[in-house]
A protein has these predicted regions:
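Conserved alpha/beta-hydrolase
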Residues: 2-16
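Short beta-to-alpha linker loops that shape the active-site pocket of alpha/beta-hydrolase fold enzymes
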Residues: 10-14, 82, 204
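Phosphate/oxyanion-binding active-site loops and adjacent basic polyanion-contact surfaces
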Residues: 17-25, 50, 176-180, 217-222
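Alpha/beta-hydrolase active-site loop
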Residues: 17-37, 53, 57
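Primarily recognizes the serine-hydrolase "nucleophile elbow" in alpha/beta-hydrolase
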Residues: 35, 41-99
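Mobile cap/lid helix-loop segments that gate and shape the active-site cleft of serine hydrolases
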Residues: 91-147
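C-terminal catalytic histidine-bearing segment of alpha/beta-hydrolase fold enzymes
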Residues: 154-163, 179-234
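Acidic catalytic loop of the alpha/beta-hydrolase fold
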Residues: 161-166, 170-174
Length: 234
């Protein structure tokens, strides 16, 4: 109806550096272009959480050097994606120390082990590795890799739901993805990206089973997102 082809690649956790994920996406893009004769300049990519992380790093690598990727995304979107791996590591340490939510503790232990293995240590041990691989780095004046999004249309949805976080995870604003998301979008706007947008929602996070959770697809307004995509594809 809108003359848009939607592709849902099945991406499971591969590497924190997203090397294998990006290789897989390159194959997907190549097949789609060959099968449907879609111009390489007409792709918009994005996703929830990890899917958004993979998409934003793909766009950054494409903008850094077009030889890095098969396509250069025309725009990118994300829903409540973590951006700064150093921040995420530190937040995971706090979740383990609090020992309040079993789900949060288990995920945090998994993440710390993974980062220590792939990066060669903690952010204190190898800070440059974290800057090198993060979508955004709060420690860097230019935002680290975020500088490669300075000319790319980007929209990120996030729902802080601070009361829910305090009650269900004992987390505060320092622990949430919204801090880095707002910081990165603000930086991009300051650097002249007039198409960098932040959407903060309230009470929209609902899982398919009806459970309230702010880290959910439902915080994205599908109709507005479709209109945004159509506008960027012009």
């Amino acid at each position: 109806e809108k003359d848009i082809l939607v592709v849902f690649p099945s991406l499971n956790w591969g590497t924190t550096k997203f090397i294998e994920e990006h290789k897989f996406l390159d194959k997907v893009f190549k097949n789609v272009i060959q099968q449907y004769q879609i111009p390489q300049t007409k792709f918009i990519i994005g996703g929830l959480s990890g899917g958004g992380m993979v998409s934003m790093r793909y766009a950054e690598r494409a903008n850094e050097n077009i030889k890095n990727t098969y396509i250069k995304p025309k725009a990118v979107f994300a829903i409540d994606s973590p951006l700064d791996f150093s921040h995420l590591y530190q937040q995971s340490e706090r979740d383990i120390e609090r020992n309040f939510s079993e789900a949060a503790v288990n995920e945090s232990k998994w993440l710390i082990d993974r980062y220590n293995s792939e990066f060669g240590g903690s952010p204190k041990d190898v800070p440059l590795e974290y800057v090198k691989n993060s979508i955004y780095s709060q420690s860097e004046k230019d935002g680290g890799n975020a500088k490669f999004l300075s000319k790319t249309p980007i929209i990120i949805y996030t729902e802080p739901a601070i009361q829910w976080q305090m009650k269900n995870r004992q987390r505060d604003l320092y622990d949430l993805n919204c801090t880095d998301i707002s910081a990165m979008i603000n930086l991009l706007q300051i650097r002249g990206n007039k198409e960098a947008e932040l959407v903060v929602t309230h009470n929209k996070g609902i899982r398919p089973n009806g459970t309230k959770h702010p880290h959910s697809w439902s915080i994205m307004d599908s109709d507005k997102m479709l209109n945004w995509i159509l506008e960027k594809l012009k």
